[in-house]
């Protein structure tokens, strides 16, 4: 993700608050946080999952249809001084456990170079996704 121009910061914060105030209560966004056991309330990491409705679609193995929402993993982070201690892995394992319990079969994410090895260890594979950023 690139740098956000200062002029857009307040607009983004307001738009995000508006989105989350609706999406969290209605279940379209679920989040996990990691906090220090010895200092409750001190958040050292987090991960989010946005649920998006999709049409029924063929399963990659081709033998059946997949139904239900697709999960888009967002906002996975660990505070710098707490990295390389398994926090992101623990958050992701819990997030994936939740998706299995809720029957969500299709999960995507956009990996940073630093996060890619973790996601590959968890079973994520690169795809051929492309993007178009049209003119507004």
Sequence positions of predicted segments:
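Conserved acyl-donor/pantetheine-binding loop and adjacent beta-alpha core of acyl/acetyltransferases
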Residues: 28, 38-75, 80-83
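Hydrophobic beta-strand residues of extracellular immunoglobulin-like
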Residues: 30-33
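Conserved GNAT-fold acetyl-CoA-binding loop/helix
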Residues: 1-19
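Conserved catalytic-core motifs of GNAT/GCN5-like acyltransferases
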Residues: 54-60, 108-116, 120, 125-136
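Short loop/turn motifs at secondary-structure junctions and domain boundaries
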Residues: 21-27
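Conserved GNAT acetyl-CoA-binding A-motif
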Residues: 92, 99-111
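Conserved acetyl-CoA pyrophosphate-binding loop and the N-cap/start of the following alpha-helix
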Residues: 82-94
């Amino acid at each position: 993700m690139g740098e956000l121009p200062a002029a857009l910061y307040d607009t983004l914060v307001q738009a995000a608050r508006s989105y989350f105030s609706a999406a969290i209560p209605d279940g379209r966004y679920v989040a996990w946080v990691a906090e220090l056991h010895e200092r409750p309330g001190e958040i050292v990491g987090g991960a989010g999952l946005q649920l998006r409705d999709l049409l029924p679609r063929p399963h990659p193995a081709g033998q059946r249809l997949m139904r239900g929402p697709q999960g888009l993993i967002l906002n996975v982070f660990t505070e710098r001084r707490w990295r390389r201690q398994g926090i992101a892995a623990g958050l992701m394992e819990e997030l994936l456990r939740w998706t299995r319990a809720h029957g969500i079969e299709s999960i995507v994410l956009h990996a940073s170079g630093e996060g890619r090895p973790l996601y590959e260890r968890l079973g994520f594979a690169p795809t051929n996704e492309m993007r178009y950023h049209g003119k507004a």
